[in-house]
């Protein structure tokens, strides 16, 4: 699913995002917007969230949204010519010692960088965020009184 970001506008609690000289949001702007909606501090201690690759100063004209950062998603992103991929699940759950192109995850990073595509993920931070994945699912199935399994950190 590809999406062209709308121009940034100030929202409650958020200042205006910066933009490139062409008026596009930057990778850094998109990261800031996602992190404002799903603060990294809400992520589980075992989880990985954030910008995996990409230059925060680069413009973003289109974004591909996906659940997992797998090869088929990278193929679609490259074919569609998007500037950024945002996934729910992380590429790496733990720190990595290498990103060799001989490793499937390393190959993913290499392909994205060569294509000039940034990769951002928001996993448990988005699950736990107010109005996030858990809240949306609860609402969809008709739950009216919900509490988190684990309290917010």
Kindly give the residue locations of the regions a language model identified.
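Hydrophobic structural segments
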Residues: 1-153
């Amino acid at each position: 699913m590809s999406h062209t970001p709308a121009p940034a506008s100030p929202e409650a609690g958020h200042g205006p995002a910066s933009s490139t000289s062409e008026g596009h949001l930057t990778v850094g702007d998109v990261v800031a917007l996602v992190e404002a909606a799903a603060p990294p501090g809400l992520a589980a201690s075992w989880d990985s969230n954030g910008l995996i690759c990409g230059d925060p100063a680069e413009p973003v004209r289109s974004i591909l949204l996906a659940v997992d950062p797998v090869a088929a998603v990278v193929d679609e992103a490259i074919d569609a010519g998007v500037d950024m991929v945002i996934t729910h699940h992380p590429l790496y759950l733990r720190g990595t010692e290498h990103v060799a192109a001989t490793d499937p995850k390393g190959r993913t990073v290499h392909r994205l960088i060569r294509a000039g595509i940034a990769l951002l993920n928001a996993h448990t931070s988005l699950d736990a965020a107010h109005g996030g994945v858990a809240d949306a699912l609860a609402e969809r199935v008709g739950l009216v009184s919900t509490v988190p399994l684990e309290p917010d950190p």
